[in-house]
């Protein structure tokens, strides 16, 4: 049996969806989906246009029907959809109406198990209601928490006789795994729609499905806790701040020299302005790869210099962030040690021992705790709280992937405003 590849066009702008589809569909896509964001933004005209552009392909309308089943299925079918998605969380009455309307208008019904508490039980129930397909779906927001669909996919595919598909972060590494767990169709979104080359990405996925190949990728996959530092090493401070809803920035903290790069977990220090005792003692307390984050009140005198830097390098400290002042800037630059600071000045204070190591501190409006993650580069430093680390490291990667796609569209001759349809999406007040 040939495994169907479904392309999920989860854009809000039809012109961007069509640009990707025109490149990807000829490379091996079987089913072309107007994603939920696209339908909400552009209406069923998105389905009509996909039907016009790809008359020989199966068109999917991801309506996520929850109520008014007959009305929504009829509308989508008349617009040209062959397959229409309905939520498994909908009532049996709604699903039955969808099934009947689908029969009347020549469309098939796909039930999406997203967020149902017992997917196997609900799959059996909706199969009995007469649906044509069932999709196991890990939603985007759960993907960001490193959830995957494969155990549920296997259980559902073994429990029902209708074709079962899968959606939720599938990429060239995991597509074959989806097939091995029982998928009859595989839904792919970001691994194609965010790829620099959608055609090449589609060909890789097609090969993975047809040959059972595992094709490694650094993108379009979500990391667990053990891989947080790897993910953060790939993203920028700006990517991470965007993921955190433009937050997490240590305002006023700047890199000591250009080209600097810092990724690590925080060991916090609070000290009196100019008192360098606790910062130097923290070097001995630090584990290799940790970053010293020092609250020195945002003022001088300096609490860090060349000799402390030599000690930190020997200990394997990844870098230092100082809300205060450092000195010996030229020597530190020659050592290429990552330093981010508010101030640089020649005068140091005295080691009086006032302060603490490992306590929560605040730099500007941002709280930093020992164990939090930091990403620093030419733009400055962004802090990722450890309690949010898995989800928002993955969201930062999602930001990077989306920017990669936008950059390619700009290179093709359009402006940023044109690619993002900026005027259309300005907030109306």
Please report, for each region that a protein language model flagged, where it lies by residue.
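Conserved N-terminal beta1-alpha1 strand-loop-helix module at the mouth
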Residues: 1-70, 126-129, 199, 232-239, ...
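Hydrophobic faces of well-ordered beta-strands that scaffold small-molecule active sites
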Residues: 3-9, 32-34, 59-63, 84-86, ...
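Catalytic cores of alpha/beta
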Residues: 20, 68-79, 117-129, 159, ...
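Alpha-helix-loop-beta-strand connector modules within alpha/beta enzyme cores
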Residues: 40-64, 97-115, 147-170, 204-218, ...
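Conserved anion-binding
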Residues: 68-152, 159
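C-terminal helical cap(s) of enzyme catalytic domains, especially alpha/beta-barrels
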Residues: 98, 179-182, 190-218, 396
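Active-site/ligand-binding-proximal alpha/beta "capping" segment
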Residues: 132-187, 191-192, 362-365, 369-397
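Feature captures the catalytic cores and cofactor-binding loops of soluble hydro-lyases/lyases
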Residues: 217-370, 383-429
